[in-house]
């Protein structure tokens, strides 16, 4: 009994510490082994996670996005950190729109293509194609590389001006103008895309021909696995 009484204060203190522990201390519990929060590896990265909100081609939050954060495989995050360091030395910073994407989000895209069009959203994101044709055109897929955890959608920021570089089209503008090598943009816009592309490739990423913002780690650690844990903090 005396031993139990002596231990009680310590038990109380431990319980109190667990109750008062900041939510951020438990953050890693939501990330499977082999994955990291991008901001933990690249604190300077700006996040604009579009599928958490409504500023995306669906016009609403997408399933599986429970927080406006970015998650990647450890290998992809480390490679992206090298990209960021290189670009920062040139006066630029990276801005991330999407990284790991759960399979449930991809399934949500499939469901969305079967619904009615919102003319306002269509004019902003896919004005020249029917939503039902987005899969056939290569803009959407039933299995996304994002779900493997080593694909990232991003752009460049001018650190001094605090503005995005002009890439000739905005993120998720599902149109040929967003393709690498598009003749529909200016030389300056092409140069901005090339700066991002050459730097990403320098550190082991490969581009996607139809989308200037889309890059995948060439030696990705999970080439055949598609994950479905939520994007959460």
PLM region spans:
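Intrinsically disordered, low-complexity segments enriched in polar/charged small residues
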Residues: 12-13, 219
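Bacterial N-terminal signal peptides
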Residues: 13-22
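Short, low-complexity intrinsically disordered segments
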Residues: 6, 210-211
């Amino acid at each position: 009994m005396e031993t139990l009484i002596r231990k009680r204060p310590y038990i109380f203190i431990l319980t109190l510490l667990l109750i008062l522990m900041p939510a951020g201390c438990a953050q890693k519990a939501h990330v499977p082994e082999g994955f990291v929060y991008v901001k933990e590896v690249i604190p300077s990265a700006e996040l604009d996670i579009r599928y958490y909100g409504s500023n995306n081609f669906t016009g609403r939050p997408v399933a599986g996005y429970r927080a406006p954060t970015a998650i990647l495989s450890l290998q992809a995050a480390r490679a992206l950190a090298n990209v960021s360091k290189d670009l920062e030395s040139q006066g630029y910073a990276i801005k991330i729109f999407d990284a790991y994407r759960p399979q449930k989000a991809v399934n949500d895209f499939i469901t969305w293509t079967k619904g009615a069009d919102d003319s306002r959203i269509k004019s902003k994101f896919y004005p020249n194609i029917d939503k039902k044709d987005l899969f056939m055109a290569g803009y959407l897929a039933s299995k996304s590389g994002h779900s493997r955890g080593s694909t990232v959608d991003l752009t460049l920021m001018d650190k001094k001006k605090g503005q995005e570089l002009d890439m000739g089209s905005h993120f998720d503008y599902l149109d040929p103008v967003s393709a690498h090598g598009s003749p529909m943009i200016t030389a300056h816009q092409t140069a901005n895309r090339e700066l991002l592309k050459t730097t990403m490739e320098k550190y082991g990423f490969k581009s996607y021909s139809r989308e200037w913002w889309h890059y995948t780690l060439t030696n990705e650690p999970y080439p055949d696995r598609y994950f479905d844990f939520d994007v959460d903090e």
